[in-house]
Amino acid sequence: MYRGLFLISEAVISRIEKKVLSGGKILFAEACDLALHCARADLDRLLALARQVGSLHHGKSIDLCSIVNARSGRCSEDCKFCAQSSHYSTGVDSYALVDPDYVLALAKQNEAYGVSRFSLVTAGRAVSPAFLREVASIYRRLGEETSLAPCASMGLLEPETAEMLVEMGVRRYHCNLETSASFFSEVCTSHTWQDKVATIEHARRAGLEVCSGGIIGLGESMEQRIELAFELRDLEVLSIPLNILNPIANTPFADLPALTEREILITFALFRLINPRAIVRTAGGRNLLAGQQKKLFLAGANGAIVGDYLTTSGDGLKKDIDMFLNLGFSIGSREK
C-alpha cells in the first residue's frame, strides 16, 4: 500500500544508491519508499542518482525516434484518454491511410536531423493482413530511400501479422501497456492488459524488438506507476516511452488534474532506476512542461519521440535537437 508521506533514513538512501550504482536491482518496496521520501525531500539527490545510472549504462547518447499517424480515427476501442476512439466526439481527423509521399518526406526530414527510428502508427484495435499488404510499399521505400530503422505501432498482434511485419522489414514493434495491470480496467474495457502482453510476446517470438511504456496522469497512484515500471522490467522491455497525459476534450479523462512537476520527475527517475539498461523515452506531453521539459533528461531520460505526436503537437525538430545538444547529449544511441 502507498503509505502517505514519510522520510527514510540517510542509511537507507545510501544503501539504495550503492546498490543501483554497482549494478544491483532496486526492490519494489525500495522504489516506493524513495517515491514517498522524495515527495517531501531530496528530489535533487534522486535525480542525480538517476542521471548517474543512465550515464553508467548509456553514456551521453540520446536515442531519437519519430512517428507518423498512418491511419487516424474511428478506433473501436474505448481507451478513456484517446482522441481517436469512436466512442468520443473529439473532432479528430479520420483517414484510412496517409499519403505515402508525405510519409517519405517526413522520414527524410527526421533523418536529416539525426533521428534513427521511424514508426508508422495506426488507430484501431488491430490491423489485418490486407492492410499490411497496403503499407508494405511504404516500408519498402523507407528501406530503399533512408537509413532509418523502421518501426510499427498497429494495435494488437496475432502471430501471422507479427511475422508479416518482419517480412516487410520492420525491426521494432511498439505496444504500450498504458498503465499497470492493477489499474488497466479503469482506463480501457474493450481489451485487456493481458492482450497487450500477448502482443509483446507475439512480436518477440516473430523476431521483432519491443518498445512498450505507458501514460502517467490517468488517475493512477504513484505505487501503480512503480508497478508498471516493474512489469516492464519483468518483460525485459528495452525501449520505454513515457507519456504525460495531455487531456483531450470530450474524452472521459478530459478533466483529470495535471500531475505536478515533482511527481513527473520522481516517476521518470524511478523508471530509470528500475530499468537501468532500457531507453527511457519521453513521449507525448513533455511539452506541457514548457521550458522545464529539459528536467526530464536530468531525471534519467535518454530517449525521445521528436516532432509531432499522434493528435497533439510536439516541439519543432530543430528546437528539440538544440535542447539535447545544450544538455550535452550526442545524437544517436548505444542501444544494441
Curated annotation (Swiss-Prot):
Gene3D superfamilies: Aldolase class I. Keywords: 2Fe-2S, 4Fe-4S, Biotin biosynthesis, Iron, Iron-sulfur, Metal-binding, S-adenosyl-L-methionine, Transferase. InterPro entries: Aldolase_TIM (IPR013785), BATS_dom (IPR010722), Biotin_synth/BioAB (IPR002684), Biotin_synthase (IPR024177), Elp3/MiaA/NifB-like_rSAM (IPR006638), rSAM (IPR007197). One of its GO terms (molecular function) is 4 iron, 4 sulfur cluster binding. [2Fe-2S] cluster binds at residues 119, 151, 211, 281. The keyword Transferase applies. Binds 1 [4Fe-4S] cluster. The cluster is coordinated with 3 cysteines and an exchangeable S-adenosyl-L-methionine. Binds 1 [2Fe-2S] cluster. The cluster is coordinated with 3 cysteines and 1 arginine. It catalyses: (4R,5S)-dethiobiotin + (sulfur carrier)-SH + 2 reduced [2Fe-2S]-[ferredoxin] + 2 S-adenosyl-L-methionine = (sulfur carrier)-H + biotin + 2 5'-deoxyadenosine + 2 L-methionine + 2 oxidized [2Fe-2S]-[ferredoxin]. Pathway: Cofactor biosynthesis; biotin biosynthesis; biotin from 7,8-diaminononanoate: step 2/2. Residues 57-286 form the Radical SAM core domain. One of its GO terms (biological process) is biotin biosynthetic process. [4Fe-4S] cluster binds at residues 75, 79, 82. Its EC number is 2.8.1.6. Its cofactor is [4Fe-4S] cluster; [2Fe-2S] cluster. Homodimer. Catalyzes the conversion of dethiobiotin (DTB) to biotin by the insertion of a sulfur atom into dethiobiotin via a radical-based mechanism. This is Biotin synthase. It comes from Desulfotalea psychrophila (strain LSv54 / DSM 12343). The lineage of its organism: Bacteria, Pseudomonadati, Thermodesulfobacteriota, Desulfobulbia, Desulfobulbales. The gene is bioB.
